[in-house]
Every structure is written in C-alpha cells, then in structure tokens.
Amino acid sequence: MAVEKFETALKKLEDVVKKLEGGELSLEESLKAFEEGVKFSAFCSKKLNEAERRVETLVKQRDGSFVTKPFEEEE
C-alpha cells in the first residue's frame, strides 16, 4: 500500500466501507475489499497515534508567559 497521506487513506477507507455496505460485491470481492479496508484502517490509526504524540498543550504560567507541555489525555 503506497498511501502517504492520512486524508487519502481515510477517503479510500470510506470508499471501501461504501462498497461493502452496498452489498453488491461477490464474496471474493468482499474479502479483498475487507482486507484493503483493514490496511487503510491500520494506516490511519498509526498516523493518528503519531499526531497525538506530537500535539502539545499551551499552558499559561502565573507570570503571564506561556510554555508548552506534552498533551496528556484526561482519563
């Protein structure tokens, strides 16, 4: 799979889902589409995880200055 951009992979994943939901594919075509969809889903998940690690939170200090801190997901 030579997809480089998240948006491209997401669009292709959406297209695969539409094909599968359409119900007009043969069993073999459905399996192939499903396998493609799993690959696109894994790629998108990986890209989202990479982006999450890069996100930083801007925090205002008492003196009015700002610093960045790593993003921490609230539980």
Curated annotation (Swiss-Prot):
EC number: 3.1.11.6
Record bears the keyword Transport: no
GO terms (BP aspect): DNA catabolic process
Annotated localization: Cytoplasm
Annotated keywords: Cytoplasm, Exonuclease, Hydrolase, Nuclease
GO cellular component: cytosol; exodeoxyribonuclease VII complex
Chief localization: cytoplasm
Catalytically driven reaction(s): Exonucleolytic cleavage in either 5'- to 3'- or 3'- to 5'-direction to yield nucleoside 5'-phosphates
Membrane-spanning segments: none
GO molecular function list: exodeoxyribonuclease VII activity
Top EC category: hydrolase
Similarity comment text for this entry: Belongs to the XseB family.
Function per UniProt: Bidirectionally degrades single-stranded DNA into large acid-insoluble oligonucleotides, which are then degraded further into small acid-soluble oligonucleotides.
Quaternary context: Heterooligomer composed of large and small subunits.
Entry protein name: Exodeoxyribonuclease 7 small subunit
Origin species: Citrifermentans bemidjiense (strain ATCC BAA-1014 / DSM 16622 / JCM 12645 / Bem)
